[in-house]
């Protein structure tokens, strides 16, 4: 139960099952279970429906899961009993008073004390800026005419805007990581891009962040899109900023896939400077196999099993890059293991079978892409950052590629931060992937380094 519930990420379910009934009242209770040295917040929402019946949903905000359907087994003056079928879990509690329920949360044969008090789970995010902001923001729209995309975003002006010559004010386009994300790159109630935009504005730097296609108010085709399409949207954002004629140097800051896109934009000579936050520099195959190995090591899986799984995954992904047609996924995995003398447990074989098609065209393109060629073409000042505890884009696999291929420039800054994860949060090895459980959104040192480096380019 290193992750409550490892199954949980598969059940980020909306409350649509309740839409047929109007909710008259909601009574929320919350508490936390302790797993080793980690705390995980859990909330239950008891709903009174218009037909007189009761319903209940469960929230685990650190894992981005809200409104998970549950079944109320018993709810009377003395006790509360809930079944969470999707997670094979239960909660049984005794009501001590109107302010306290003491009970046990059980899943897969393990049980954890869980005391509840009235109120919803509230995650603490101390770095998220609160309005009113001491700087101006503007809601904007720009178009990628070539691909029929319309992107909505926020242009944030620095505090000093209007008091400086505009040619001295740099502006940065913020590009999110993989998957559809909003302009704040929001994850587990963290809003990294909002925090970055706020910090930059307070240090004389403008920024534009935008919702990805199909997210919030942004529109455009999403079926079958790859990193190249996301690059095209980012290039449209840069063109928009240039046409505004409001700023001086125009750069890009990308995180994860966005960091790789930043390298591509540098190769295209479309930006004056670039910042890659945990951007992939190694080829996609190496990145994905590496992150799988790192995740398995965190889970305490034996080294021999990890190496066998990595061998199988490497072969499978190479077949996928080559366009091999696989009709029977289960049989393909069995044949692969037999041919390579791999003795993997059934659950890992099932994972391999899913990897044959998982992620669609985006993953297939990503696996085959090697950013090093783009990096060799970069002429503009480049900042590339990674954390030693990044389990998604491993610094040991990526920073050396950047150092080896990036043409010399005394304005470059390549830096590795000790004990920072993929989101640049401080963490321990065991909590490197526990993004939601960490209150810090992004290291202050990273924010300072970004702002200082951009301002040094003026």
Regions found by a protein language model. Name each.
Residues 121-167:
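N-terminal cap/lid segment of alpha/beta-hydrolase-fold proteins
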Residues 224-244:
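Alpha/beta-hydrolase active-site loop
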Residues 277-377:
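Accessory cap/linker subdomain of secreted extracellular hydrolases
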Residues 380, 391-405:
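Short alpha-helix in the alpha/beta-hydrolase fold that links the catalytic acid
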Residues 237-301:
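Primarily recognizes the serine-hydrolase "nucleophile elbow" in alpha/beta-hydrolase
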Residues 378, 384-386:
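Short beta-strand/loop motif that positions the catalytic acidic residue
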Residues 22-95, 100-108, 127, 164, ...:
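Central antiparallel beta-sheet cores of small beta-barrel/beta-sandwich binding domains
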Residues 163-166, 178-201, 208, 284, ...:
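Short substrate-entry loop that stabilizes the transition state in hydrolases
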């Amino acid at each position: 139960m290193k992750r409550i519930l490892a199954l949980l990420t598969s059940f980020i379910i909306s409350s649509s099952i309740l839409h047929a009934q109007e909710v008259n009242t909601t009574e929320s209770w919350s508490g936390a279970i302790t797993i080793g040295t980690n705390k995980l917040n859990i909330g239950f929402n008891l709903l009174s429906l218009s037909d007189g019946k009761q319903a209940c949903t469960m929230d685990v905000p650190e894992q981005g899961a809200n409104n998970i359907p549950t079944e109320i087994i018993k709810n009377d003056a003395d006790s509360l009993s809930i079944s969470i079928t999707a997670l094979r879990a239960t909660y049984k509690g005794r009501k001590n008073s109107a302010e306290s329920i003491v009970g046990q949360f059980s899943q897969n044969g393990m049980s954890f004390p869980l005391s509840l008090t009235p109120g919803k789970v509230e995650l603490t995010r101390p770095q998220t800026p609160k309005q009113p902001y001491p700087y101006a923001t503007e809601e904007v729209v720009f178009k990628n005419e070539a691909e029929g995309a319309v992107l909505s975003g926020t242009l944030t002006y620095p505090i000093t805007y209007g008091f400086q010559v505009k040619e001295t004010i740099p502006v940065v386009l913020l590009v999110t990581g993989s998957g559809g994300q909003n302009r704040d790159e929001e994850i587990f109630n963290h809003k990294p891009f909002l925090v970055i935009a706020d910090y930059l504005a307070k240090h004389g730097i403008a920024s534009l962040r935008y919702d990805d296609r199909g997210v919030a108010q942004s529109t455009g085709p999403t079926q079958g899109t790859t990193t190249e399409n996301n690059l095209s949207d980012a290039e449209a954002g840069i063109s928009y900023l240039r046409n505004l004629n409001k700023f001086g140097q125009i750069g890009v800051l990308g995180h994860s896939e966005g960091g790789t896109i930043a390298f591509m934009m540098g190769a295209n000579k479309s930006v004056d400077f670039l910042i890659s936050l945990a951007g992939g520099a190694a080829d996609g195959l190496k990145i994905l196999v590496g992150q799988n190995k790192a995740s398995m090591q965190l889970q305490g899986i034996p080294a021999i099993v990890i190496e066998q799984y990595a061998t199988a995954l490497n072969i499978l992904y190479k077949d996928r890059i080559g366009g091999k047609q696989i009709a029977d996924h289960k049989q393909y995995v069995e044949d692969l293991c037999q041919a390579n003398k791999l003795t993997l447990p059934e659950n890992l074989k099932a994972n391999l079978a899913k990897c044959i098609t998982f992620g669609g065209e985006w993953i297939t393109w990503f696996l085959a892409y090697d950013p090093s060629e783009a990096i060799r073409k970069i002429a503009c000042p480049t900042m590339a950052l990674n954390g030693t505890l990044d389990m998604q884009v491993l610094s040991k696999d990526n920073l050396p590629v950047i150092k080896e291929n990036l043409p010399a420039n005394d304005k470059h800054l390549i830096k590795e931060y000790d004990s920072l994860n993929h989101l640049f949060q401080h963490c321990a090895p065991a909590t490197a992937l526990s993004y939601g459980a960490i209150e810090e959104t992004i290291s202050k040192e990273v924010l300072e380094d970004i702002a200082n480096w951009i301002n040094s380019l003026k």
